[in-house]
Amino acid sequence: MRIILASSSPRRRQLMELLGIEFEVEKPDVEEEFLESPEETVRELSLRKAEWVFKKRKEEEILVIGSDTVVVLDGNILGKPESLEEAKGMLKKLSGEWHVVYTGVAFVSSETKDVIVSSTKVRFRELPESVIDYYVEKYRPLDKAGAYGIQDFAAVFVEKIEGDFFTVVGFPLGMVWQYLYEKGWWKFASKREDDKGGARVAFG
């Protein structure tokens, strides 16, 4: 079975590579919208992304993985900013506050349609406006929910975190691996002489 990551995110691609499996990447054409709750939003959007790619390539034996992330502050969903000014506004709101990051991951194949959702609480330090301006101008976080990437300079914004770090990055790696492992889609293959002590990973 071939694995396809339905995402344009370089961060999700990098995290998938840590699983040691072969996979392809295809960007889904899905309009993002906020639903009644953050859980429902990431659940539905991750599923739409995976289904879009699956339907496009439905003649193939594939497993498609889609993911979506939102940030929630005081009950309000923050998605990706549409401008640098909006990004600065989001970070000003997050400054010194707790917020919750929700990430959904969908798995779609001819026999599977499952979604897992993970949430993590994050508290930011008080951020000087000059630091916010520096970050937004240098990193231009228009592709990131909440206008920040915890894996880049914005890591210094974080005062406390409660939950899974990779949920905040946008791909809860441990949960993804556990799902694939329990379904029998991730397993060690036999070692080869040219592995130099390592192990290959195969999908069942």
Curated annotation (Swiss-Prot):
Cofactor(s) named in the record: a divalent metal cation
Any one cellular-component term (Gene Ontology): cytoplasm
Active site residues according to the UniProt entry: 68
Superkingdom field: Bacteria
Pfam families xrefs: Maf
EC number: 3.6.1.9
Main subcellular location of this protein, as a coarse class: cytoplasm
Gene Ontology process terms (BP): nucleotide metabolic process
Record's keyword terms, sorted: Cytoplasm, Hydrolase, Nucleotide metabolism
Cellular compartment(s): Cytoplasm
Matches recorded under InterPro entries: ITPase-like_fam, Maf-like
GO MF term list: dTTP diphosphatase activity; UTP diphosphatase activity
Reactions mediated catalytically: dTTP + H2O = dTMP + diphosphate + H(+); UTP + H2O = UMP + diphosphate + H(+)
Feature type site, description Important for substrate specificity: 11, 69, 151
Role, per record: Nucleoside triphosphate pyrophosphatase that hydrolyzes dTTP and UTP. May have a dual role in cell division arrest and in preventing the incorporation of modified nucleotides into cellular nucleic acids.
Family (UniProt): Belongs to the Maf family. YhdE subfamily.
Protein name: dTTP/UTP pyrophosphatase
Naturally occurring in which organism (per UniProt): Thermotoga petrophila (strain ATCC BAA-488 / DSM 13995 / JCM 10881 / RKU-1)
High-level lineage: Bacteria, Thermotogati, Thermotogota, Thermotogae, Thermotogales
